[in-house]
């Protein structure tokens, strides 16, 4: 949270609202749930993460930096600057560790649905009963604005129909839009709608409760025949004097409010300061854990290649794009 406040303040541009209320969820996801390898961000069997609400990019960048991706503290200081590695919305061709570019609200869930379809297709085509080389999840963080977009529901309907159990959406329900309270423009019962689309719906009453978020994510992972949506109640701009209002949605906190927000978190340090114990925590719980998962997967791949050489050759060519396809032939 503190890094994000500093990034947005220095740029004098950005969206702190969702960043501050969604930080506990993504901290939990990165450090306790996702299997990723910052040393090899292109690892084929890594879990995927899609930031549907791309305006909350500072939160993703802070997590990528802390996790050990090729994103320095100086890069964070260049947030939203021309030709920086930390643009206003994430771009897969610019920033190490970004799995999906973000654009207009609504596109994140469809993008993730496509990823989950690809995972399921590859798993069913190549996995064997004694050897699974494709086995990863796709996670999404979305907000109220995404739920107001029709394409989100179209993709969600397809995901439920296809039983994409490895698609997990975290819905940051802070009930505030840039224009004001969500009630001005939206009153749907999202829970009932997703239940009707064959999704598992899990509710978290407090978006600051890391233990509850962790339990919800683990429960979601166990349901392999339905996609899951975790409806998480949050307070937009948590810690700001304007928390809970649209004033904190898309404007920097400023020096005074930013400092007071940090104090409310129990963090009283200079801008962009990161304690060494924080880096150590992320190294242990993200990088080291991900490296172990990667090495375990490599052993599985070696076993698979030995037992099923033809299937492995086909899989490898498909993944690496080594096929020549000509529809005229």
Protein language model regions, located:
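Thiamine diphosphate
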Residues: 1-138, 280, 284-329
């Amino acid at each position: 949270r503190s890094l994000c406040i500093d990034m947005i303040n220095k740029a004098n541009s950005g969206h702190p609202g969702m960043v501050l209320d969604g930080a506990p969820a993504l901290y939990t996801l990165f450090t306790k749930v996702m299997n990723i390898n910052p040393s090899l961000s292109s690892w084929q069997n890594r879990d995927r993460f899609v930031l549907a609400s791309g305006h909350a990019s500072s939160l993703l960048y802070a997590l990528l930096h802390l996790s050990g991706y090729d994103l320095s503290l100086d890069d964070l200081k260049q947030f939203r600057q021309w030709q920086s590695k930390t643009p206003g919305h994430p771009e897969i061709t610019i920033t190490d560790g970004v799995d999906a570019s973000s654009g207009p609200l609504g596109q994140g869930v469809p993008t993730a649905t496509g990823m989950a379809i690809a995972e399921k297709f590859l798993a069913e085509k190549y996995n064997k009963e004694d050897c699974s080389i494709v086995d990863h999840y796709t996670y999404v963080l979305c907000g109220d604005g995404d739920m107001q977009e029709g394409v989100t529901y179209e993709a969600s309907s397809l995901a439920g129909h296809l039983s994409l159990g490895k698609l997990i959406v975290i819905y940051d329900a802070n009930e505030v839009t840039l224009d004001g309270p969500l009630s001005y423009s939206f009153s749907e019962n999202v829970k009932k709608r997703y239940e009707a689309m064959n999704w598992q719906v899990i509710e978290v009453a407090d978006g600051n409760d890391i233990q509850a978020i962790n339990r919800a994510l683990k429960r979601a992972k166990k349901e392999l025949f339905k996609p899951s949506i975790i409806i998480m109640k949050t307070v937009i701009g948590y810690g700001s004097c304007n928390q809970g209002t649209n004033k904190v949605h898309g404007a920097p906190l400023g020096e005074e409010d930013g400092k007071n927000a940090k104090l409310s978190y129990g963090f009283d340090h200079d801008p962009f300061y990161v304690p060494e114990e924080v880096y150590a925590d992320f190294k242990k719980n993200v990088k080291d854990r991900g490296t172990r998962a990667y090495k375990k997967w490599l052993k599985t791949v070696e076993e698979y290649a030995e037992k099923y050489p033809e299937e492995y050759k086909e899989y490898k060519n498909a993944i690496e794009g080594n096929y020549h396809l000509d529809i005229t032939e």
